[in-house]
Amino acid sequence: MAAKDFLPRAIPLVTVDPYFNIWSFSDHLYDDTPRHWTGHQNSMTGIIRVDGKNYRFMGLVETEREMYYLEPEPLRQLSVKLTPTRTVYTFGNEAVELRVTFTGSLLLDDLDLMSRPASYVFYEVRSVDGKAHEVTVYLDISSQAAVNESSQTVLFGKDENGIYCGRGEEGMLTRSGDDLRIDWGWLHLAAPDHQYVIVNTKDKKNALSGSPYLHLPKFTKLDGCLSDRVHLEQEVREGIPCLGCLKTSGVDGKETMTGLVILGYDDIHSIEYFGKQADAYWKRDGRSFDEVFKKAIDEYEAVSARTQAFDEELKKEALVYGEEYYDILCVAYRESIAAHKLIEVDGEIRFFSKECYSNGCIGTVDVTYPSIPLYLKYQPKLVEGMIDPIFHYAAGDDWKFPYA
């Protein structure tokens, strides 16, 4: 990587809300499996095949360290660049260059867009040597993103937008405390122009073993079992089943290969607020997840253009105070917004921070105070959404202590 790359302790990949919140804790995207912000695995794997040889660009095939497995050779990471709304990785060798961009739709001037439960992974492959190359790109996200513990069971299915897995309404909003992850609702993957697959670690290892070739039939062995709303059930710790997709194309000196993967999460109900199960802001006016997710798929290009324009605007303002200040903002912007959940209660917005530890509390003043400047600048309504629940709670009988 370039010596000047800014490398924070954790690099944002998927930043939607406190539960759908995945980061890379390593300098290279392929050094370790991506993780939830609590530190637990939310594995994602990326494999690129170039002229019959497999390279790994994201995560690990075998996520259990005690299970010895010779991982595919990584495609060397050349750089990682952060902007307020995007993380851009570049990989390459003497034949091809692969650029992978993780984008969050976190624009504070548009609450519908900011609260949208979707995140983008866009990739582009180009020929470096000017020659023609056959390329296959495979990307997955594991069902770990839909459970609190790997002993839990998930269901898999397919719908008009793509494929999904999860636990539905089972156990919804029944846990509180430290070190918890969502274990209800549905994790979704959509990938236009890709082949959908559902595989586990064993499937991936079998497909990659014995030869340098990625055996596509083994990657698709479960695909034929799926039809609309038909479920396959599997325990997460039994092989870490994943939602996956792959695409094959050719690149040369003129033609590049591109692909778009959209990750989404339908949490059904988001927060229990004074005894009432409250929904996310994006659900207001009766909107369904399928409708909102389809809109996220269709609007990628427009969202990408808007986020890039915002990034440039913020960069121009921040660089007045120095490059290091801008680097910090590139991490803090997504971290702060995705540490909150935006809901609507009786026509009023509520914007809750969520602790991953510190008792797992929401709406804590010690988090609200330092984060307020961001929202005063870009969306003061969210400041009201932070403070109103605190006043509501303080006015009630639940808090009986003489201190704040």
Predicted regions and their residues:
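Beta-strand-rich N-terminal accessory domains
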Residues: 1-61, 75-79, 92-100, 111-113
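Acidic/polar, glycine-enriched structural segments that form the non-catalytic walls/loops
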Residues: 2-9, 106-113, 124-363, 380-384, ...
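Well-ordered alpha-helical scaffold segments within catalytic/enzyme domains
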Residues: 18-26, 46, 91, 122-127, ...
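Helix-terminus loop motifs that line ligand-binding clefts
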Residues: 35-36, 47-92, 382-404
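A short, sequence-level motif marking secondary-structure junctions
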Residues: 60-65, 102-107, 142
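Short Pro/Gly-enriched beta-strand edge/turn motifs at strand-loop
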Residues: 67-73, 100-106, 228-231
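Short, solvent-exposed loop/turn segments enriched in Ser/Thr/Gly
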Residues: 115-120
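An alpha-helical repeat/solenoid feature that recognizes helix-turn-helix modules
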Residues: 363-369
